[in-house]
């Protein structure tokens, strides 16, 4: 019988994406080895949102490929609309596989209330 884990990874700095993605990959690997079903989310807010914009394509090509691979494994990736507004990033510029939520911190609070484990690499 599979055991269920709900995990949320939070990143708010552009330079934390690599470790956040590595943590996601490790969680998926360990879950598979331990016969766990994982509901894994990555929530980006503040300046980390900049890396999810098509405008930052040149600097984040590897990140984009990594996030697509994670999404293909069932990871949901969320971006904060409040941060987008603050940074003047239009929603049409966000990578198409990223889901926009009204508030990243509120989304995190809701998930914690629902029992998600919170990890900020």
Residue ranges and their predicted role:
Residues 53-121:
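A cross-taxonomic marker for long C-terminal extensions/tails that follow the last structured domain
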Residues 8-21, 54-55:
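Short, glycine-rich nucleotide/cofactor-binding loops
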Residues 40-45, 78-81:
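Short internal beta-strands
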Residues 3-7:
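Extreme N-terminal starter segment of soluble prokaryotic enzymes
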Residues 37-41, 48-51:
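Short, well-structured secondary-structure segments
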Residues 2, 34-38:
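Short helix-terminating capping/connector loops at secondary-structure junctions
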Residues 19-35:
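Histidine-anchored nucleotide/phosphate-binding helix
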Residues 14-15, 47-50, 83-86:
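Solvent-exposed loop/turn segments at secondary-structure junctions
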């Amino acid at each position: 019988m599979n055991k269920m884990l709900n995990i949320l990874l939070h990143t708010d700095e552009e330079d934390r994406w690599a470790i956040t993605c590595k943590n996601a990959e490790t969680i998926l690997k360990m879950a598979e080895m331990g016969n766990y079903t994982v509901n894994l989310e990555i929530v980006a807010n503040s300046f980390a949102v900049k890396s999810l914009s098509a405008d930052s394509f040149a600097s984040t090509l590897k990140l984009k490929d990594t996030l697509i691979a994670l999404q293909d494994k069932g990871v949901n990736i969320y971006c904060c609309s409040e941060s987008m507004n603050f940074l003047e990033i239009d929603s049409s510029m966000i990578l198409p596989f990223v889901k926009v939520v009204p508030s990243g911190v509120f989304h995190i609070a809701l998930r914690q209330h629902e029992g998600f484990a919170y990890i900020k690499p």
